[in-house]
Amino acid sequence: MKVIVGLGNPGSKYKETKHNIGFITLDEIAYRQNVSFNNSNFEADIAEFFIGTEKVLLVKPLTFMNESGRSVGPLLTYFGVDEEDLIVIYDDLDLEIGKIRLRQKGSAGGHNGIKSLIAHLGTNVFPRIKIGIGRPSKNDTVIHHVLSTFPKETHEEMLLAVKKAADAALYACEGHTFVETMNQFNGK
């Protein structure tokens, strides 16, 4: 079983914000797979489908970004899923809008959702797909930047990054190792 987690905040207020790019990407995957999200006992909305014989869960934690691990940790334990079968998709300030970067492990890098996952999983070794949201302008704060929507002029680049991230996540679920997936999608 593979588990793809998109990080974001629940509620219509946050639906199209930069911080919700993980949720937006899971919506793209769900659309492609023709599946819908349902509420679960894990403080998350979950959709499921199969790629061949591989069951895939799409997970949107409903705990708000900073408590994502509270949802994901128990879910992985319940389903007996190891961290290497987890893929986390989230926003990254250090990447330009339209860019993605795949990593097998790493620190939280100041991202509170990842910090929560590391704390609840007890490891920083899990595959991740980072989607660029760019840095705030000099007159903007990080909090305002991540909780704002994408400027209209960057919408096309954002959608392209979402599609690339969805492609990468699905590729990893098709029997490819995450190293193969990184080689296929990093720098493209």
From Swiss-Prot:
Subcellular location: Cytoplasm
Swiss-Prot/TrEMBL site (Discriminates between blocked and unblocked aminoacyl-tRNA) positions: N9
Chain residues that bind tRNA: Y14, F64, N66, N112
Pfam families: Pept_tRNA_hydro (PF01195)
Domain of life: Bacteria
Main location group: cytoplasm
Annotated site residue numbers, Stabilizes the basic form of H active site to accept a proton: D91
GO CC annotations, alphabetized: cytoplasm
GO biological process, one term: rescue of stalled ribosome
Catalytic activity: an N-acyl-L-alpha-aminoacyl-tRNA + H2O = an N-acyl-L-amino acid + a tRNA + H(+)
InterPro entries reported for this sequence: Pept_tRNA_hydro, Pept_tRNA_hydro_CS, Pept_tRNA_hydro_sf
Enzyme Commission number(s) of this protein: 3.1.1.29
Residues in coiled coil: none
Entry keyword set: Cytoplasm, Hydrolase, RNA-binding, tRNA-binding
One MF term in the entry's GO annotations: tRNA binding
Keyword RNA-binding: yes
Family indicated by similarity: Belongs to the PTH family.
Role summary: Hydrolyzes ribosome-free peptidyl-tRNAs (with 1 or more amino acids incorporated), which drop off the ribosome during protein synthesis, or as a result of ribosome stalling.
Entries under NCBIfam families matching the protein: pth
UniProt subunit comment: Monomer.
Name under which the protein is recorded: Peptidyl-tRNA hydrolase
Species, as recorded: Enterococcus faecalis (strain ATCC 700802 / V583)
Gene behind this protein: pth
